[in-house]
Swiss-Prot record:
Cross-link (Glycyl lysine isopeptide (Lys-Gly) (interchain with G-Cter in SUMO)): K294
The protein's name: Regulatory protein E2
UniProt PTM: Phosphorylated.
Source organism of this protein record: Human papillomavirus 52
Region spans: Disordered: 225-255
Compartments reported by the entry: Host nucleus
Classification via Pfam families: PPV_E2_C, PPV_E2_N
GO MF assignments: DNA binding; DNA-binding transcription factor activity; nucleotide binding
Family the UniProt entry places it in: Belongs to the papillomaviridae E2 protein family.
Length: 368
């Protein structure tokens, strides 16, 4: 029992030395969390032995010591991973590597250079909330670290990661509690972001724009099909189709002969005879084996870079994407899709490429 107070005193002395030194060396911050973990371990053991006081300190409950030890381990591991990147020498203080900073949104990322954004709910100066945005957010993956800048719009605070807009603060969540009218203003850097025009007032213009874009796409496809006359032809009436399905719905014969469709894509449709994957022909299109890699977007980004060193083991690989829905879904998980020429190539890929346990592998097929 005598050794626990002595060891605890030594650990706490070292922690105080780090506080007084106030170093911006990352190794010092790693040491700080190592010592914090050891302090919690000693408190845990003391309580287990029935010790209630060590000097003037009350020994906390075992559950408290265990929880704080887990937090210290989490910070220590994150800092050790950061220490392996090119940003290890940027200068890191105790405040920047504190538990409070680690838990601030976006959680479990290191952040620097915060600034305040004020949201005025109901356009009432007495009904405001302050939020912190960050000029530097360190997205720490398994093999690399990327710095992104926090941004703001009417809907919340966000950053871009691998082409994906990720909100880490949504003002609508607080609006449910503090807002009556459902309208607010965002004040940042002397500028005010107000509520955008309602969807209903723009329905006509939005529809017209969509139709215009579709028309332009069709025209472009028509040119790229390769007709001898490169001038755009005016729209013509479709020929009466002469193929009928079970519901008396008719389709042009030329679509079933694998000819290119001007108003769809420039690739055209692949017939059953043209498809190399004859075992999976459906609706006259060619299907290919695929896998979906599902997990944390940063882990997927890192994995995608590793996969690119095995280009002979797949055909195409997508950027990180995710499902969007009005229902409650975990949009924080990203998905990367990889296509293969055949089943043999997919199996060879899975045998060769090491995929982390944190990434879920979903096999399937996709029409191309």
């Amino acid at each position: 029992m005598e050794s626990i107070p002595a060891r605890l005193n030594a650990v706490q002395e070292k922690i105080l030395d780090l506080y007084e030194a106030d170093s911006n060396d990352l190794n010092a911050q790693i040491e700080h969390w190592k010592l914090t973990r050891m302090e919690c371990v000693l408190f845990y053991k003391a309580k287990e032995l029935g010790i209630t006081h060590i000097g003037h300190q009350v020994v906390p409950p075992m559950a408290v010591s265990k929880a704080k030890a887990c937090q210290a381990i989490e910070l220590q591991l994150a800092l050790e991973a950061l220490n392996k990147t090119q940003y290890s020498t940027d200068g890191w203080t105790l405040q920047q590597t504190s538990l409070e900073m680690w838990r601030a949104e976006p959680q479990k990322y290191f952040k620097k250079h915060g600034y305040t954004i004020t949201v005025q709910y109901d356009n009432d100066k007495n009904n405001t909330m302050d939020y912190t945005n960050w000029k530097e957010i360190y997205l720490l993956g398994e093999c690399e670290c990327t710095i992104v800048e926090g941004q703001v719009d009417y809907y919340g605070l966000y950053y871009w990661c691998d082409g994906e807009k990720i909100y880490f603060v949504k003002f609508s969540n607080d609006a449910k509690q503090y807002c009556v009218t459902g309208v607010w203003e965002v004040h940042v850097g002397g500028q005010v972001i107000v509520c955008p025009a309602s969807v209903s007032s723009n329905e006509v213009s939005t529809t017209e724009t969509a139709v215009h874009l579709c028309t332009e796409t069709s025209k472009t496809s028509a040119v790229s099909v390769g007709a001898k006359d490169t001038h755009l032809q005016p729209p013509q009436k479709r020929r009466r189709p002469d193929v009928t399905d079970s519901r008396n719905t008719k389709y042009p014969n030329n679509l079933l002969r694998g000819q290119q469709s001007v108003d769809s894509t420039t690739r055209g449709l692949v017939t059953a005879t043209e498809c190399t994957n004859k075992g999976r022909v459906a609706h006259t299109t060619c299907t290919a084996p695929i896998i979906h890699l599902k997990g944390d977007p940063n882990s997927l980004k890192c994995l995608r870079y590793r996969v690119k060193t095995h280009k002979s083991l797949y055909v195409q690989i997508s950027s990180t994407w995710h499902w969007t829905s009005n229902e409650c879904t975990n949009n924080k998980l990203g998905i990367v899709t990889i296509t293969y020429s055949d089943e043999t190539q997919r199996q060879q890929f899975l045998k060769t490429v090491k995929i982390p346990n944190t990434v879920q592998v979903i096999q399937g097929v996709m029409s191309l």
